């Protein structure tokens, strides 16, 4: 660079962001790979959603609706929520980004737990805010630690419930206690995995009743639409109004809107996926425990397998790859001794349990 050229610096915080790495889907030299690294629904979207997207493709030359009225109406109908208090985005990631853009900034703080979703830190930095991480208690959100970690500068508190990658969760009374203890901040309940929990509204009732609670949800998990990128948020009208002012008018395509609406309305497909996930989640956790690999009780569509140390976990991951199985290392979440394993279909679960059993047996014999 010549002396006459200058480097134009980005906004504060941008260069603190580490590039996000999604779950791998290929292994060099290995065929018939089973991907269990991204918490995807192994059964994919419902047939009704597929059909709706095909129909919508005939209108790709038309701009989509800007108000997302059809999708918001379907969400409101299914969940018993006011559609006017719902905002839709490009995955729940975009909603998280909107919240940080609108309510955080230089000199403010964004609070989250040590094993929380990486997008909280990324979005805080993108807004120029200070990300603040607090400890968990045995891989479970510690409400007291969050309350103690809050300051007058705290503007947002993110709690994934259930949490990714631990799969653990806290009760709604605890979340309400947190919201009331830190009234100057918005408590964001990230309920991406809420559909995998029985008798749980993801924090919707709290977001209806309290002025500083906001809930985010996604179509990427149980709805099987990770490739479509659709999420939504629900909370006080005042917050939704603010977020809509920075939302791009055409952020969701016609295909995304129609596919997500049809997926939301197909409750039979969701019920089948819920039942199968619960069945195989329990089976896989027990099967791995019998092979000396424990895990916490998971409330999501994955389990967090714990090994003796980081070296053992890493070696197991490499062994799984040689057998065509891709799981997720979670050292970036502060859990280097763990592997996160998506609950796949029955064949995939049995296969990964068998291969991990082989690995553990071979490792024991080599000592």
UniProtKB/Swiss-Prot annotation:
NCBIfam families: hisC. The modification N6-(pyridoxal phosphate)lysine is found at residue 221. This is Histidinol-phosphate aminotransferase. Its EC number is 2.6.1.9. Pathway: Amino-acid biosynthesis; L-histidine biosynthesis; L-histidine from 5-phospho-alpha-D-ribose 1-diphosphate: step 7/9. Its cofactor is pyridoxal 5'-phosphate. It comes from Paracoccus denitrificans (strain Pd 1222). Keywords: Amino-acid biosynthesis, Aminotransferase, Histidine biosynthesis, Pyridoxal phosphate, Transferase. The keyword Heme does not apply. It catalyses: L-histidinol phosphate + 2-oxoglutarate = 3-(imidazol-4-yl)-2-oxopropyl phosphate + L-glutamate. It is an enzyme of class 2 (transferase). CDD domains: AAT_like (cd00609).
């Amino acid at each position: 660079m010549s002396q006459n050229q200058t480097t134009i610096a980005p906004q504060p915080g941008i260069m603190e962001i580490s590039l996000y790495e999604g779950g791998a889907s290929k292994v060099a030299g290995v065929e018939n790979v089973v991907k269990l690294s991204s918490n995807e629904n192994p059964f994919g979207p419902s047939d009704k959603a597929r059909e709706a997207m095909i129909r919508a493709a005939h209108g790709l030359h038309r701009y989509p609706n800007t108000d997302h009225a059809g999708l918001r109406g379907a969400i409101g109908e299914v969940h018993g929520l006011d559609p006017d208090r719902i905002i839709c985005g490009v995955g729940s990631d975009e909603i998280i980004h909107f919240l940080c853009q609108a309510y955080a900034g230089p000199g403010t703080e964004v609070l989250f737990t040590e094993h929380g979703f990486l997008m909280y830190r990324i979005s805080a930095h993108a807004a120029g805010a200070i990300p603040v991480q607090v400890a968990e208690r045995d891989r479970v959100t510690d409400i007291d630690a969050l309350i103690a970690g809050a300051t007058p500068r705290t503007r947002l508190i993110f709690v994934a419930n259930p949490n990714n990658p631990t799969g653990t969760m806290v009760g709604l009374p605890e979340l309400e206690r947190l919201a009331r203890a830190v009234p100057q901040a918005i408590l964001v309940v990230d309920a991406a995995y809420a559909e995998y929990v029985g008798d749980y509204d993801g924090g919707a009732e709290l977001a209806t009743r309290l002025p500083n609670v906001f809930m985010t949800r996604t179509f990427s998990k149980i709805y099987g639409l990770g490739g479509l990128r659709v999420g939504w948020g629900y909370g006080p009208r005042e917050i939704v109004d603010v977020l809509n002012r920075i939302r791009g008018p055409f952020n969701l395509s016609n295909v995304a809107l129609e596919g997500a609406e049809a997926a939301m309305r197909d409750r039979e497909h969701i019920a089948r996926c819920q039942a199968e996930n619960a069945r195989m989640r329990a089976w896989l956790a027990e099967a791995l425990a019998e092979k000396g690999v424990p895990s916490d009780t998971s409330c999501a569509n994955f389990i967090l397998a714990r090994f003796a140390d980081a070296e053992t976990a890493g070696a197991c991951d490499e062994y799984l790859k040689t057998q065509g199985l891709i799981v997720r290392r979670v050292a970036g979440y502060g859990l280097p001794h763990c592997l996160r394993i998506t609950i796949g279909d029955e064949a995939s679960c049995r296969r990964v349990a068998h291969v991990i059993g082989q690995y553990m047996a071979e490792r024991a014999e080599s000592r």
